[in-house]
């Protein structure tokens, strides 16, 4: 009889303990649970169900900070000259705006250089909303559409920063030229020193890159039309396996089709592939793009169901896609979803802008490479607090396969690598505009 009160107490303690364990092990409330179709070939939980430990968010000093008043007098006018594909030009624009504020200059609308390689002829105003950009940059930096009459007839003094080696300092190297010529143009250097940026210059860069750049109304209309045509929910996949991409990587792929091998050889020029131990070292460093077949294996290792709707955010000329679409059958592309006449008329920048819009708004984003588009998309998704973003690890894939792992053992090892990456947000390489928060 003495033991009768103890039993209810024991049951209560046991029940409470189990409830506490369930709460602690439940997925973080910050994680967006995407109702992707069931049917994973490797398990019941996909990568998006992994509980995150760290999270990137826009830094408070930028979003909530007080603007430093602009000086009464400008040191001159700066035009940022942007080259390459759309996302490379956008990267240069972001850097250039921060530099212009650093040098207390007035910003002239950037010049998007015609690039024959990208089949492109559109300028900044053809892709981005100029008035929106000027409005959002108000208080951060003065932006003008037209130069004063005494300067408008002159060509800017061109300052070549892009290929400078070593740490490049704009205050020491460019400010004297701006004061001398009053109107200069430049392409930002990759090796610039940001440690000398005051907070107001960094805030200007962040504002320009993540708050002020908006597609033109006509282009946004096309992007919304494309987005609406994709079955929901969906994953946006940035897959890079074009002939020029493979040729540039200098990697060897022995099991490709004859047509793919011929296309790669035609694009190689003097970029011969590495051989022997150098080839293995290069691959283990993560320098070789994933093939579509390797991408399939990677997605399956992450328990991404083969019935998932996938939007292929990619350029023209992808090779070896049969191996991918035979497994993941719900694949959608711009060329299929858009009006064929409109699609045929589109230039490279327009297509890249559409991929960008879809990718920053998709339920999930996966990249097989880590190029300019991936960096911009990852940052914008973070800005929008959309955290289902992942970069497939080429380095881990090469290292694990070199150890002889295959089948279920390889998939399990790849899962562990990417589970860790997703949990702590590793690999995003986000710029100074974002800060890490412990969850």
Curated annotation (Swiss-Prot):
Protein EC: 2.4.1.-
GO MF annotation list: glycosyltransferase activity
Ranges that cross the membrane: 8-28
Keywords: Carbohydrate metabolism, Fucose metabolism, Glycoprotein, Glycosyltransferase, Membrane, Signal-anchor, Transferase, Transmembrane, Transmembrane helix
Membrane topology, record value: Single-pass type II membrane protein
GO biological process: fucose metabolic process
Residues modified by glycosylation: 104, 119, 293
CC annotations in GO: membrane
Matches recorded under InterPro entries: FucosylTrfase_pln, GDP-Fuc_O-FucTrfase
Enzyme class of the recorded protein, top EC level: transferase
Signal peptide region: none
Positions contributing to substrate binding: 238-240
Compartments (UniProt record): Membrane
Protein name from the UniProt record: O-fucosyltransferase 13
Natural source organism: Arabidopsis thaliana
């Amino acid at each position: 009889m003495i033991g009768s009160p103890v039993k209810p107490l024991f049951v209560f303690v046991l029940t409470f303990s189990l409830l506490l364990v369930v709460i602690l092990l439940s997925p973080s409330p910050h994680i967006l649970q995407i109702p992707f179709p069931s049917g994973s070939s490797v398990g019941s939980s996909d990568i998006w169900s992994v509980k995150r430990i760290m999270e990137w968010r826009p830094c408070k000093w930028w979003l909530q900070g007080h603007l430093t008043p602009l000086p009464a007098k400008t040191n001159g006018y700066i035009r940022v000259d942007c080259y390459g594909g759309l996302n490379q030009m956008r990267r240069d624009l972001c850097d250039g705006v921060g530099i212009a504020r650093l040098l207390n200059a007035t910003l002239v609308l950037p010049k998007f250089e015609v690039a024959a390689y990208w089949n492109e002829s559109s300028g900044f105003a053809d892709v981005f909303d100029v008035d929106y950009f000027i409005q959002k940059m108000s208080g951060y930096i003065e932006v003008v559409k037209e130069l004063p009459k005494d300067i408008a007839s002159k060509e800017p003094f061109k300052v070549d920063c892009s290929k400078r080696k070593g740490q490049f300092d704009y205050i020491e190297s460019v400010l004297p030229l701006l004061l001398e010529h009053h109107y200069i143009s430049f392409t930002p250097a990759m090796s610039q020193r940001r440690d000398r940026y005051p907070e107001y210059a960094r805030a200007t860069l962040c504002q320009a890159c993540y708050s002020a750049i908006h597609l033109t109304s006509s282009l946004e209309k096309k992007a919304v039309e494309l987005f609406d045509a994709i079955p929901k929910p969906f994953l946006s996949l940035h897959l890079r396996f074009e002939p020029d991409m493979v040729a540039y990587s200098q990697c060897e792929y022995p099991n490709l089709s004859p047509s793919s091998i011929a296309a790669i050889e035609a694009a190689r020029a003097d970029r011969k592939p590495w051989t022997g131990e150098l080839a293995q070292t290069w691959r283990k460093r993560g320098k070789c793009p994933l093939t579509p077949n390797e991408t399939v294996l990677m997605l399956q290792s992450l328990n991404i169901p083969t019935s998932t709707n996938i939007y292929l955010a990619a350029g023209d000329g992808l090779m070896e896609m049969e191996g991918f679409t035979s497994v993941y059958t719900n694949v959608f592309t711009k060329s299929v979803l858009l009006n064929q006449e409109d699609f045929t008329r589109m230039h490279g920048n327009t297509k890249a802008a559409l991929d960008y819009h879809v990718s920053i708004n998709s339920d999930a984003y996966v990249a097989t490479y880590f190029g300019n588009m991936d960096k911009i998309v990852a940052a914008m998704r973070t800005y929008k607090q959309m955290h289902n973003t992942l970069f497939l690890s080429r380095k881990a894939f090469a290292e694990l396969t070199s150890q002889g792992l295959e089948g279920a053992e390889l998939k399990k090892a790849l899962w562990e690598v990417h589970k860790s990456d997703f949990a702590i947000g590793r690999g995003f390489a986000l710029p100074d505009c974002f800060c890490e928060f412990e969850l």
